[in-house]
Amino acid sequence: MAGNSILLAALSVLSACQQSYFAMQVGKARSKYKVTPPSVSGSPDFERIFRAQQNCVEFYPIFIITLWMAGWYFNQVFATCLGLVYIYSRHQYFWGYAEAAKKRVTGFRLSLGVLALLTVLGAVGILNSFLDEYLDIDIAKKLRHF
């Protein structure tokens, strides 16, 4: 069973490393801009880095859930490829935001697009599994007849 989801698991570890990296950047920014915990305001440069990291944390559960649902119920390889694009887009978002608030937009939009696609693929896969399991309707088989 574990071998069936190795790509999803590996990408999950990679994404957790990215989250840790972003958190470390906030720690470095705290030192650089002299913002001591629990304060979350101070230099605008610090605040942008902090907000970028917090936004990544806020979207992380959505990413993990949609990644695994699309991978389990639709296609693991395709979901993993989309997950790699998501990780890239979050990297672009984080460093764009750290530089200037307006530079975050491209990475943010790309990440939202990936999340939307993962959500749709997961929903389609779950619907197909439900129909096959409980109503004995195999959509993939029916589509091959066209």
Curated annotation (Swiss-Prot):
* Ways its activity is controlled: Each monomer binds on GSH molecule but only one subunit is catalytically active.
Q: Which InterPro entries match?
A: 5_LipOase_AP, MAPEG, MAPEG-like_dom_sf, Membr-assoc_MAPEG
Q: Which GO terms describe its biological process?
A: leukotriene biosynthetic process; lipid metabolic process
Enumerate the PANTHER family for this protein: MICROSOMAL GLUTATHIONE S-TRANSFERASE, MICROSOMAL GLUTATHIONE S-TRANSFERASE 2
Q: What does this protein do?
A: Catalyzes several different glutathione-dependent reactions. Catalyzes the glutathione-dependent reduction of lipid hydroperoxides, such as 5-HPETE. Has glutathione transferase activity, toward xenobiotic electrophiles, such as 1-chloro-2, 4-dinitrobenzene (CDNB). Also catalyzes the conjugation of leukotriene A4 with reduced glutathione to form leukotriene C4 (LTC4). Involved in oxidative DNA damage induced by ER stress and anticancer agents by activating LTC4 biosynthetic machinery in nonimmune cells.
**Subunit structure, interactors included:** Homotrimer.
Q: Which gene encodes it?
A: MGST2
GO MF annotation list: enzyme activator activity; glutathione binding; glutathione peroxidase activity; glutathione transferase activity; identical protein binding; leukotriene-C4 synthase activity
A Pfam family found in this protein is: MAPEG
Q: Which GO terms describe its cellular component?
A: endoplasmic reticulum; endoplasmic reticulum membrane; intracellular membrane-bounded organelle; nuclear envelope
Family matches, as Gene3D superfamilies: Membrane associated eicosanoid/glutathione metabolism-like domain
| Keyword Transferase applies | yes
- Name-wise, this protein is Microsomal glutathione S-transferase 2
- Catalyzed reactions: RX + glutathione = an S-substituted glutathione + a halide anion + H(+); 1-chloro-2,4-dinitrobenzene + glutathione = 2,4-dinitrophenyl-S-glutathione + chloride + H(+); leukotriene C4 = leukotriene A4 + glutathione; (5S)-hydroperoxy-(6E,8Z,11Z,14Z)-eicosatetraenoate + 2 glutathione = (5S)-hydroxy-(6E,8Z,11Z,14Z)-eicosatetraenoate + glutathione disulfide + H2O
Membrane topology term reads: Multi-pass membrane protein
Q: Where are the transmembrane segments?
A: 6-26, 59-79, 111-131
Keywords on record:
Endoplasmic reticulum, Leukotriene biosynthesis, Lipid metabolism, Lyase, Membrane, Microsome, Oxidoreductase, Transferase, Transmembrane, Transmembrane helix
Coiled-coil regions listed in the entry? none
- Annotated family: Belongs to the MAPEG family.
What is the annotated localization of this protein? Endoplasmic reticulum membrane; Microsome membrane
Which Enzyme Commission number(s) are on file for it?
2.5.1.18, 1.11.1.-, 4.4.1.20
Instruction: Report if keyword Protein biosynthesis is assigned.
Output: no
